[in-house]
């Protein structure tokens, strides 16, 4: 899987939009047969998506046709301004982006409130296939360059 270590997503807004050109990955990850349809892997930072630890690696598959987005699934969405990991719901000419962390402020408002992403502002969408988190190891991680 091409791994773009200089590209990250956060569970909020990330202004580090970088190139995920398949011809220029930072490294290659040998994931065996875990994610055979993966087209990219990037790091996730933040706490708005509780299923992904900050610093974990997301295995992704690029979605070329926005009409095939599955409501309620997790995606990495990249615009010219930011890259985020969110659950998506189709809402006409935009997607509603939801966090799975339902934490609230003292007044009851969500800290990670849903927001709208215009479809015509989206450069790339990737379906999250899975996540790899290293908690502890004294062994080497298999990475090919």
Where are these regions (language model features)?
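Short, compositionally biased
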Residues: 49, 70-83, 91-93
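Amphipathic alpha-helical interface segments
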Residues: 96, 101-145
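Short, positionally conserved secondary-structure boundary motifs
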Residues: 1-54, 63-67, 121, 131-145
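Residue-level recognition of conserved beta-strand edge/terminus positions
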Residues: 60-62, 78
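Short, mixed charged/polar active-site loops
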Residues: 83-85, 112
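Structural motif
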Residues: 53-57, 73
